[in-house]
A protein has these predicted regions:
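A short, Trp-centered hydrophobic/proline-enriched beta-strand micro-motif
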Residues: 12-24, 63-66
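Active-site-adjacent beta-strand anchor residues
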Residues: 46-47
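Short, structured beta-strand-loop surface elements
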Residues: 50-90
């Protein structure tokens, strides 16, 4: 059953590990777990600059992010878009 926008925002705000899919150098999909924060309608992803997912995003910023809850009531959201680097204060 589809979630309302309010339910979706609440779900994405509560869950902090997702699976990101990127495109590798051979043009194949590559998926990996990633930490994120949902803020103001956007997913902010956290990864190191030496990771394969970072290199893939630098070469091809098209990504898909899957967030799911694997216990009843099962829920999931898939976000497709373009990744871009954002500077943050730590």
């Amino acid at each position: 059953m589809p979630m309302t926008n309010q339910e979706l925002n609440k779900f994405l705000s509560e869950t902090h590990v997702a699976v990101i899919s990127t495109v590798d150098a051979d043009n194949r999909p590559r998926s990996a777990p990633i930490w994120y924060e949902w803020k103001d309608g956007a997913a902010y992803l956290f990864t190191g600059r030496r990771t394969l997912k970072w290199r893939n995003i630098q070469d091809n910023p098209n990504v898909s992010l899957c967030v799911d809850w694997r216990e009843p009531p099962y829920r999931s959201a898939i976000i497709q878009g373009t990744a871009e680097e954002v500077e943050v204060d730590m």
